Amino acid sequence: MVVADVVTEFIEGLVETYPGLQYLDGFPEVKVVIRADASGATYDKVAVISGGGSGHEPAHAGFVGEGMLTASICGDVFASPSVDSILAGIRAVTGPMGCLLIVMNYTGDRLNFGLAAEQARSEGYKIETVIVGDDCALPPLLGIAGRRGLAGTIFVNKIAGAAAAAGLSLADVAAEAKRASQMVGTMGVALSVCTLPGQVTSDRLGPGKMELGLGIHGEPGAAVADLQPVDVVVSHILKQILSSVCSYCGASLSFLTPCRLPLPSRKT
């Protein structure tokens, strides 16, 4: 396996599997996946674009489709996509209704998407941006750059995509996405750290240990603890997300299980 080809091969496989998707001219240097039925010149709805570093599949290219993303901008593994790639994606799918950029709260993503948005506006495109920072592992004051963007971005993508599909204006789609981003909170639990293709897996987490709030790129979490029964882990996570420190509240909850964790369960 050639490490540099990992992202390219993922995109090729995705597009070959789903005929409703395509990639832009310039691939693989420009790693942009778009809906095959979305053409900027004629697209009559708000375009919803997200993206970021690869290595978190199915995010974000796997979320391109009707009622969700119009396009996904893919960087290399754990690397923000370039300004040129983001701008190419905007130009490809943005019509008269404008474009909403959904950006996870990481410095590189915010910088590159922000620069691309400024350039697109200077070319006459209508652009709005929503930043998603849903990580509840660390109190706000302990996060220098603010909360990290995590799996809660999926909800923001879906709500924005549904609003765009319904024909709402750019301002209304952005407002719905912003409200969703303010209402979502996420905390993860990991039994091992992430592994980059072609590199040795870290042994920082030993057997029988788990890390609460480990970052999706291997950033330190809130604490390392002994492995606990799943009900204890879930209870701790919910208390953190719903605490006054994190400022999330609501009468209903939704749960995402992005991967199976072999946590021990209690015998009843």
Kindly label every feature range from the protein language model.
Residues 56, 60-96, 235, 239-244:
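Glycine-rich oxoanion-binding loops at beta->alpha junctions
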Residues 1-48:
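N-terminal amphipathic/basic leader segments beginning at the initiator methionine
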Residues 132-183:
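Short alpha-helices
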Residues 57-60, 83-87, 108-114, 137-140, ...:
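Short glycine/serine/threonine-rich phosphate/pyrophosphate-binding segments
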Residues 164-268:
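Mixed-charge interfacial surface used for oligomerization/domain docking
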Residues 110-125, 143:
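Short Gly/Thr/Asp-enriched flexible loops that form oxyanion-binding sites at enzyme active sites
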Residues 46-53, 69-72, 98-107, 114-117, ...:
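Short glycine-rich or small-residue beta-strand-to-loop segments that form or flank ligand, phosphate
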Residues 43-51, 60-73, 137-140, 210-226, ...:
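Gly-rich Lys/Arg/Thr-decorated short loops/hinges at beta-loop-alpha junctions or inter-strand turns
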